[in-house]
Amino acid sequence: MEGVLYKWTNYISGWQPRWFVLEGGTLSYYDSQEDAWKGCKGSIKISVCEIQVHPSDFTRVDLIIPGEQYFYLRAINAAERQKWLVALGTAKACLTDNRTKREKELQENSEALKTKMSELRLYCDLLLQQVNKIQESPLAETSAGSGEGGDETGNLVKSTCTTFLKTLEECMHIASRTFNPDLLSRTPPGSPSVATIKPQKIKSNDPKNLHPGETRKDLINTSGTSAHESGPDNEPPPSPQENISTAHTESGLMEDQNDLIEPNNGSSSSTQDHEEPVEEQQTDGSTEDADHSQEEQQEVSMSPTQNKQEVQEDIQTDLELNETQSENKQEEEDEDKVDTFFSTMSHRFSDIILEEDSGIPTQAFLDSCYAIVPVLDKLGPTVFAPVKIDFVGNIKKIQQKVVSDPESFPTLQSIVLHEVKTEVAQVRNSATEALLWLKRGLKFLKEFLSEINTGVKDVQGALYNAYGKTLRQYHGWVVRGVFALALRAAPSYEGFMAALVSYEGDELKEGFRTGMHRDLDIYLPAMENQLSILDTLYEEYGLESDEIV
């Protein structure tokens, strides 16, 4: 659809006729139909904007992207406005339906993947329980004493466990990078810990024929063999994170082996420290082997069901303790830090890194200017609309200058110096003039926020003082009247504070005031420094103007 609509330009020029074209979900406007070949003067995406119908003016419709773009439009009559509303609503509905469909598909895929992750964790629990049961059963001891058959069985079980645990750990790391890490940070109820797996119970040789020291060495070699079989020869090179996770898993298994083997080596090590006859050493060794066999029989005689219940009870207790500690830690963090509007801004003056000779990066500065516009909305979206329109209009004038030759205007100073050189700096609607009014508007906001930061709770008084220090001297009686009306409609201190939080009710928390002072103490000095640099530049080239509008 296309046609003529009246667009609000500023509080001096008022409503001006423009040629509008709605195509492909984008509304673009031109000076006139004849000048359309020159390119559009501006555009707005219908899918992301709010379409607001004026409550009293039956010819007006507003298109708003909060904090970014504002199109205030009027049709020739109510019937014409209705046509545009139908066209705009249809375009928005079509685009929204497609976007909703994509979001729904993404959500369904996410839920399906989460379900698969839960199943994977269940399979992990079952495998760990089965391995634990096999290791605790008499069959494991019998097969361990059967020579090569026991050696094969032991290596196979250990290799399978190591490979499965490593693969499972890799899957969990991938999932944690894809979704919220908290999803995988806790062990589900009933999941046996890795420490319950006791690889040393499956012996590769008869311990009666080996010295205790050789038994320990053989176990370590067996562990190394199984790790080698499931290692890099059969799998792609792991990432650094996978190396770390594998190292932790292997070190945990080795610690369990050492803890259970060292008591058996204690007597042998003390025996080896002294020179004694060979017969005595053999006698001591046979005695130790007999004791060790009795201990193993006692362990085997334990009920697998009883062992499983004890493991589950221990894990459940640890899980509850970890959850309690996590909740307490989260509560402490929530009390210490409260997000404010200034800590969650997409772009901030305090994040701008100046270039050589205090050069202010153009795009970063303009993005920070766009990001502070919502403060005017929080003061009053209706009464401050003319101020906001003028503020955003100046930003766009500078943006158009940058778009014309981005490489030539990396800093604000380069724009001003270029226009000074070409003698267009003081021409009406030049980028230099737009920057002049933009920095005046920023000074107004800085003075107002500075008063609020010092503890002033009279929002209307703070606005009046800031206006008197910055903009009032450049305004005639008409514009002063507009500002006076806006100041009288300013919100209360509590209402303004409530608009500066990310979550409703945060303004009542103890950490909110501290967070607000913390954020403004960082934000305002950086803003003041950059405005001071611009003031110095304008004074140096005599670009300041006392003209009253």
Swiss-Prot record:
Location(s) in or outside the cell:
Cytoplasm; Golgi apparatus, trans-Golgi network membrane; Membrane
- Membrane topology recorded in Swiss-Prot or TrEMBL: Peripheral membrane protein
> A Pfam family in this protein?
PH
Where is the region Disordered? Answer: 180-245, 257-312
Give a yes or no for keyword Transport in this entry: yes
One term of GO molecular function: ceramide 1-phosphate binding
The intrachain disulfides are none
Where in the sequence does UniProt note compositional bias of the Basic and acidic residues kind? Answer: 203-219
Keywords for this entry?
Answer: Cytoplasm, Golgi apparatus, Membrane, Protein transport, Transport
Mark out the compositionally biased spans (Polar residues).
Answer: 299-309
Q: Which InterPro entries does the UniProt record give? A: GLTP_sf, Glycolipid_transfer_prot_dom, PH-like_dom_sf, PH_domain
Residue ranges of domain PH in the record: 1-93
Which GO terms of type biological process are on file?
A: ceramide transport; intermembrane lipid transfer; protein transport
Record carries keyword Cytoplasm: yes
Q: Name one GO cellular component term.
A: cytosol
Mostly located where?
cytoplasm
What's its job?
Cargo transport protein that is required for apical transport from the trans-Golgi network (TGN) to the plasma membrane.
- Report what the protein is called: Pleckstrin homology domain-containing family A member 8
Give the organism, scientific name.
Danio rerio (Zebrafish)
The beginning of the lineage is: Eukaryota, Metazoa, Chordata, Craniata, Vertebrata
